[in-house]
Swiss-Prot record:
Family as reported in the entry's similarity comment: Belongs to the protein kinase superfamily. Ser/Thr protein kinase family.
Originating organism: Schizosaccharomyces pombe (strain 972 / ATCC 24843)
Any one cellular-component term (Gene Ontology): cytoplasm
Enzyme Commission designation: 2.7.11.1
Protein name (Swiss-Prot/TrEMBL): Serine/threonine-protein kinase ppk15
Alphabetical GO biological process terms: regulation of establishment or maintenance of cell polarity; signaling
Database matches in Pfam families: Pkinase
Enzyme class per UniProt: transferase
Iron listed as a keyword: no
Entry-annotated residues carrying Phosphotyrosine: 291
Length: 534
């Protein structure tokens, strides 16, 4: 400190002479008042306070730390009045990998994805410009970015499609289906469907603007450490998803890819969900694709190569509801053959008419005649591996029990905890009966959404009385057929289900519709089946 710096007095009296007694000075200035009392004041330099020094844009003084960080541009403009800051001059961080421009005049990378940058803009028309904030995910179709509408300041999700004709054409179908559903069938946004706000072209990429939602149900299960959710929460999700699938059936639209990843929470404060990703959806009268649905949720008629309808979404929904309660997929097949094996092990063989008409039946089944009746037997893993020139793996078993009843009634595996109360036992029996209607192998007998809405699991009615009214036993014992079990031929073959005539897939099965499973089971906390997220 400068030795000539003045001392700030605490009174109107002149300051006393300086003392050289360092033991009493202690970095303070000593003053004597008129009454003879000695006073001390902090030593402060008298500096000229410029009006513009450390001043925020609103005129108040700010700390040096704030001035040199968040207010750095303002500080520099004070030092150099000619300096003008623009956010467009900020370094742009790439969000797309790889980020090197290869195609489309350098705008696209080697995978034909548009290279996204933070603070870059999507859209060029006035009133249709979106500031890129971050990335939300990517897939075979392209990328999803978190953006801000510069006109309304609303935060949205924008799906940027790859610059390839096949993806463009498929997304045009997605747009037409969503506009039909949003505008005609659900204009009031009450049926749990994602809302499409806008679509436009940007640098030869189709961009779809959606409402921004929260995490998906798979992430919810993962955050719950793969422990099942409480049945009351499963019931809430089931009610909403039945409302959605009922609307889809009314519009004769098949989603074709229902799974936990495509069901998102609206926000983290409530259990309201919405169904997303209609990129694989189609009209019931235009079912040209046969390689559809994610494997864990793929219906038997799709595996066998039969014609399909909205019933395949109900099969997927049954698998999803079981997974929400159990914490793990009910049929986690590691291949399509293994997927079929898991289904047959738990539910038995499909009806003979399905095996007779399935385009892929010969791939999975041996056929023959016993006493003049045609029979079918699922091929062994050894035979299937030899015939298809690949090594099939049996797949890990995540449940100790094999029947659906036993899996649900005994989950979680209890060691020291008491048995289920009668009320809990009946509630689980009700849930078992409910999802069995979704997991009906025969698509002609599988329940529709409107039928499922009237089940006691949804309505809350007495399940015991329901069983009496339906003349069914309260405690059902599900029979599990052996995979080599033969089924007698049926006389009537439903004409509405015909062989699918087209196979469209340009990607190997192992690269799509897969998801890693946790390496452990049962989960760490095996004595509780509660949801800790809400």
């Amino acid at each position: 400190m400068d030795s000539d710096s003045p001392i700030l007095p605490l009174s109107n009296n002149p300051p006393a002479a300086r003392t050289h007694d360092h033991s009493q000075r202690n970095n303070h200035a000593r003053h004597v008042s008129s009454s003879g009392t000695t006073l001390f004041a902090p030593v402060k330099p008298a500096t000229k306070k410029y009006n513009y020094r450390r001043v925020s844009p609103h005129g108040s003084y700010i700390s040096p730390l704030e001035a040199m960080t968040v207010k750095l541009a303002d500080t520099y403009s004070i030092c150099n009045p000619k300096f003008q800051f623009s956010s467009e001059q900020n370094p742009r961080r790439p969000l797309t990998k790889p980020s090197e421009g290869v195609h489309n005049h350098g705008f696209d990378n080697v995978n034909h994805d548009y290279v996204l940058y933070v603070n870059d803009l999507l859209g060029t028309d006035e009133g249709r410009k979106y500031l890129i904030l971050d990335t939300l995910g990517h897939g075979t179709f392209g990328q999803v970015a978190r953006c801000q509408d510069l006109k309304t300041q609303q935060i949205v999700a924008i799906k940027v499609i790859k610059n390839k004709p096949a993806f463009y054409n498929q997304c045009v179908m997605e747009v037409s289906i969503l506009e039909l559903l949003n505008n005609k069938y659900d204009p009031e946004d009450k049926r749990h469907l994602i809302r499409l706000y806008d679509q436009f072209m940007h640098k030869n990429h189709l961009c779809l603007v959606f409402e921004l939602l929260s995490i998906n149900l798979y992430e919810l299960i993962k955050q719950n450490q793969f422990r099942g959710l409480h049945l009351s929460l499963v019931r809430s999700f089931a009610t909403q998803l039945l409302s959605c699938t009922s609307l889809l059936k009314q519009a004769r639209i098949i989603h074709c890819d229902l799974k936990p990843e495509n069901i998102l929470l609206q926000d983290l404060s409530s259990p309201i969900v919405k169904v997303i990703d209609f990129g694989s959806a189609c009209h019931e009268r235009q079912t040209v694709y046969t390689y559809i649905q994610s494997r864990f949720y793929r219906s038997p008629e799709v595996i066998l190569g039969l014609h399909y309808n909205c019933g395949i979404d109900m099969w997927s929904l049954g698998c999803i509801l079981a997974e929400l309660f159990l914490g793990l997929p009910l049929f986690p097949g590691n291949s399509e053959y293994n997927q079929l094996c898991r289904i047959v092990d738990m539910l038995g063989n499909p009806p003979t008419w399905m095996l007779e008409m399935g385009k892929n039946s010969k791939k999975y089944y041996n056929s023959g005649f016993v006493n003049g009746r045609k029979t079918y037997e699922l091929k062994s893993i050894e035979q299937f591996s030899i015939e298809n020139n690949k090594t099939e793996q049996p797949g890990k078993q995540y449940f100790g029990e094999k029947t659906l009843d036993a899996i649900v009634l005994n989950y979680p595996r209890r060691k020291t905890t008491p048995k289920l109360t009668p009320e809990e036992h009946e509630e689980r029996l009700c849930f078992i009966d409910f999802i069995k209607q979704f997991l009906e192998l025969n698509p002609l007998k599988r329940w529709t959404p409107d039928q499922a809405k009237n089940h006691p699991f949804i309505t809350g009615a007495s399940f015991s009385q329901y069983c009496i009214d339906k003349q069914k036993p309260l405690l059902t014992t599900q029979r599990t057929r052996n995979r080599s079990h033969t089924i007698g031929n049926q006389a009537v073959v439903p004409p509405s289900l015909q062989r699918a005539s087209t196979y469209v897939s340009n990607e190997p099965e192992e690269f799509v519709h897969t998801r890693p499973l946790p390496q452990y089971y049962p989960p760490a906390n095996e004595n509780e089946n509660v949801d800790e997220f809400f």
